[in-house]
Amino acid sequence: MKPDSIRRYNVIGSRRISNYWWAIIIGSGGLGFLFTGLSSYLQFNLLPIIHAEKIIFFPQGLVMSFYGILGIFFSLYLGLTILFSVGEGFNEFNKELGIIRIFRWGFPGKNRRIDLSYSIDDVKAIRVELKDGINPKRTIYLCIKGQRQIPLTRVGQPLTLEEIEMQAAELAQFLQKDLLLN
């Protein structure tokens, strides 16, 4: 096997620093709201920095408890996506075997392993989608016969314009397919 006949790109998935950050922030905020709501119900300060006896339980304390529970659930969900490495995987392009393999981890269950394989001959082109603005979108797609387009880049933190162009051009040249800009 020649070292130039295989290209493999790892995809980070949910184990990004920003997901850890948001899980901690949302979880601690949720706990703060829940303790404040419970303190207003019990008329006893569970947190020494908050004077909950000044908060009426119905409706303020009840609403704060609800938001606290909701925040804790969101934090747990984010924590589980990090724990199970949801979205993590790789894109492998093997010219020697003539296959493209796209692998991702999902949530536990019957379909935890997402493993797609395609023939290189089924690939029509590599397409790059660029959208600027408040929420920029920079994605490389694998265009397969039958009008199917499979995203190859990670979700969340977009690559720089230079990185996306280099990766798409390198991939199109490696597969000897057309490069489309959209």
Swiss-Prot record:
It is a multi-pass membrane protein. Its main location: plastid. GO terms for cellular component: chloroplast thylakoid membrane; photosystem I. The keyword Metal-binding does not apply. The keyword Plastid applies. One of its GO terms (biological process) is photosynthesis. InterPro entries: PSI_Ycf4_assembly. This is Photosystem I assembly protein Ycf4. It comes from the Eukaryota. Belongs to the Ycf4 family. Keywords: Chloroplast, Membrane, Photosynthesis, Plastid, Thylakoid, Transmembrane, Transmembrane helix. The lineage of its organism: Eukaryota, Viridiplantae, Chlorophyta, Ulvophyceae, OUU clade. Seems to be required for the assembly of the photosystem I complex. Coiled coil: none annotated. The chain crosses the membrane at residues 22-42, 66-86. It is found in: Plastid, Chloroplast thylakoid membrane. It comes from Tupiella akineta.
